[in-house]
Amino acid sequence: MRRKNTDDFIIVYLSNDVSDFELELTWLKDHPQPYNLGECEFHLAFQAEDYEAAHKKHKEMRCICFENEAMGIYFIVDPDGYWLEILP
C-alpha cells in the first residue's frame, strides 16, 4: 500500500503481487458531506505507454474534457459521458 498525503486530499493505492492492477482511493478533505455514490466521484484510469502520443491523439479527437497539467494527467469522456483518466 502506498499513501499520498496533501493539504487537500489523501490518496491510498492498493495492489497485490498477483497482477499489475492498482486501486486508488481518494479522500477529499474539504468534501462538505459524506460521499454519495451518485456524485460520480469514481472513474477508471489507464496508464499510457506513450503519454505524449496518447494526449496528441485524444486532443485531435476532441475528447479531452479536463486536464490537470500540474499533476500531469488528463481525462477523456467516452460516448456515454463517463470520464476516463489518462496517466503517464
Enumerate the language-model features and the residues they cover:
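Core segments of cupin and vicinal oxygen chelate
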Residues: 1-22
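Short secondary-structure boundary/capping segments
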Residues: 3, 13-15, 33-36, 65-66
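Short hydrophobic/aromatic beta-strand micro-patches
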Residues: 15, 45-49
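Short hydrophobic-acidic sequence motifs that mark active-site Asp/Glu residues
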Residues: 22-24, 83
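Vicinal oxygen chelate
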Residues: 10-13, 52-88
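Eukaryotic phosphotyrosine signaling hubs
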Residues: 39-43
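Acetyl-CoA-dependent GNAT
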Residues: 27-31, 88
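Residues that form or immediately flank small-molecule/cofactor binding pockets and catalytic motifs
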Residues: 5, 30, 70
